[in-house]
């Protein structure tokens, strides 16, 4: 099937169904224009938006902006620019005084990004980006000098208020994304309205080849998993500075989505569970939206080494006596092109990521699943969950994988090179070929855009998010039975053609609050309760009690945009049991 024809059909189908079905994305009563109409310079509103606010921090003064209910301080540097000789090295704490720093700009600069794939796949990506407005599908321009923190707080907050802190880690497959995509104003407005004010912090970290370059040379240099180290230094900055903004450094909850959610788990297992800084814990709670453990091969495995070797070859460094130093010496554009010469997230390889956190014996001593199973992690109360149709978005890029044999070959060659063909075949066979059992779920014979799509979407979603979530929860309950956890399944976008309640749709509902419905209000309330009390049920109590997962293996089901239920966490149990029993072979 030609991609252009497929995309045209996808676009027509989505537009038709969304306009006709209240189960998809019903339009709110009023949506503001994306580009507001010009306002006369003398307008008092302009003066209000331009108001400045200052905060004295240990290394200087930060100047932010104040608008309505929220003060914003965007793009505060927490590390020296990772450029030149600092490229492909662990972050170096800011070595100079901050002085008076203007953080009143509109956004913080992004780190260098993975290119959107060329060819037919880019047509799909461009359409999805335009139609769905999912941040990690939106191309952005980055720069190497990008290690910054953004802080937002309720207007009028002052040092000593000791508000709890919500530390956001963006997603994007460890290849895309930036803190600037995630303004916390909507979250803070809701929290303020229900008397649960907090401090919102968003960290920038290096992605793709700049932040997660693998290879034996990288391991030997001690320069693996740099993006995770950037996040960790951001947390340390919070410990040192957030009190000046009115936050409590002892009440930090880390929250992420997709790769950001996986990063939250990785922060829990970093250094074998050592999350201390200056004798205190860097965070006391964790929220993970769509991502937990990703069993991975070592940073110097054959699979990982092939990525490094490709980058070296593309960068013209193959003949160098020190290939890593050669990469550091390349111009920005040349290194960017070399780093992006390997397959990306939005390509045929899809979730078989080129760049991701990998065990290195130090930062990640072992694969995250092993660290959790053996209790080598910072065990804190946590919420974790998934969207019902996590895999649909990523199953769009393999229209030729139409048979069981091709699916087995695809998974074994790109995902699970350590598994035998028999193991991969047995895994695939736990997923029926009947259309009614595939994803998007509960849609009968509908949405099979090409042969094998719904089955593959089910498998990809389970392997990377949905069922690994259950494996993680069980392992954590076994290792630390006294630490509470809560889990959820979100289906509030049921009826969205082809995609269902897809990966990233929680950003639209929960983070941005696109629609002021029950899904948005209840999830935010549960989360804000957790930020305050480490329990989603304590605080604002107008919603049903969310049962702890370990007590009953039950999920909070955000069933529709206007209804929540409690269900058993037992869907696709045969597949779950197989994945759990073969976790050692199913590593990426």
UniProtKB/Swiss-Prot annotation:
The active site is at residue 258. Disruption phenotype: Greatly reduces lipolytic activities at the early stage of incubation on minimal medium supplemented with either saturated or unsaturated lipid as the substrate. Also leads to growth deficiency on both liquid and solid minimal media supplemented with the saturated triglyceride tristearin as the sole carbon source. Does not affect pathogenicity. It is found in: Secreted. It catalyses: a triacylglycerol + H2O = a diacylglycerol + a fatty acid + H(+). Belongs to the type-B carboxylesterase/lipase family. Secreted acylglycerol lipase required for efficient utilization of saturated triglyceride lipids. Is not involved in virulence. This is Secreted triacylglycerol lipase LIP1. It comes from Gibberella zeae (strain ATCC MYA-4620 / CBS 123657 / FGSC 9075 / NRRL 31084 / PH-1).
